[in-house]
Amino acid sequence: MSEPQKSEPQKSEPQNGRGALFAGGLAAILASACCLGPLVLIALGFSGAWIGNLTVLEPYRPIFIGAALVALFFAWRRIYRPAQACKPGEVCAIPQVRATYKLIFWIVAALVLVSLGFPYVMPFFY
């Protein structure tokens, strides 16, 4: 008789917050796309009446802001969790990796805050 084959538990990729950081940055860019997009195009030399149509994302801005803040919260929670929550062989247990993720988190958080606040200071540029 043959023994039934035991399936090994599948190892999942270690969760380290990269996805949440990316989602937060993308949502912040989308939240400010209605206001930042025309200014960037004008600064690059593009012009025309069609630039006024780029405000189509304005009604969705609160949703994108909420998504950016939620993603940043989950990234912060994942990155700043205690080292004891990491198993010894995982990437998050390595101090250099943890320091790099913290640095990247604060850079992304600053960029998110700048892009979220940009629509409020944009009138000073026109």
Curated annotation (Swiss-Prot):
<keyword id="KW-0614">Plasmid</keyword>
<keyword id="KW-0813">Transport</keyword>
<keyword id="KW-1133">Transmembrane helix</keyword>
<feature type="binding site">
    <location>
        <position position="35"/>
    </location>
    <ligand>
        <name>Hg(2+)</name>
    </ligand>
</feature>
<keyword id="KW-0479">Metal-binding</keyword>
<dbReference type="GO" id="GO:0015097">
    <property type="term" value="F:mercury ion transmembrane transporter activity"/>
</dbReference>
<dbReference type="InterPro" id="IPR003457">
    <property type="entry name" value="Transprt_MerT"/>
</dbReference>
<feature type="transmembrane region" description="Helical">
    <location>
        <begin position="104"/>
        <end position="124"/>
    </location>
</feature>
<feature type="binding site">
    <location>
        <position position="34"/>
    </location>
    <ligand>
        <name>Hg(2+)</name>
    </ligand>
</feature>
<feature type="transmembrane region" description="Helical">
    <location>
        <begin position="54"/>
        <end position="74"/>
    </location>
</feature>
<keyword id="KW-1003">Cell membrane</keyword>
<keyword id="KW-0475">Mercuric resistance</keyword>
<feature type="binding site">
    <location>
        <position position="92"/>
    </location>
    <ligand>
        <name>Hg(2+)</name>
    </ligand>
</feature>
<dbReference type="GO" id="GO:0046872">
    <property type="term" value="F:metal ion binding"/>
</dbReference>
<comment type="similarity">
    <text>Belongs to the MerT family.</text>
</comment>
<dbReference type="Pfam" id="PF02411">
    <property type="entry name" value="MerT"/>
</dbReference>
<keyword id="KW-0812">Transmembrane</keyword>
<keyword id="KW-0997">Cell inner membrane</keyword>
<keyword id="KW-0476">Mercury</keyword>
<protein>
    <recommendedName>
        <fullName>Mercuric transport protein MerT</fullName>
    </recommendedName>
</protein>
<comment type="function">
    <text>Involved in mercury resistance. Probably transfers a mercuric ion from the periplasmic Hg(2+)-binding protein MerP to the cytoplasmic mercuric reductase MerA.</text>
</comment>
<dbReference type="GO" id="GO:0005886">
    <property type="term" value="C:plasma membrane"/>
</dbReference>
<feature type="binding site">
    <location>
        <position position="86"/>
    </location>
    <ligand>
        <name>Hg(2+)</name>
    </ligand>
</feature>
<feature type="transmembrane region" description="Helical">
    <location>
        <begin position="26"/>
        <end position="46"/>
    </location>
</feature>
<keyword id="KW-0472">Membrane</keyword>
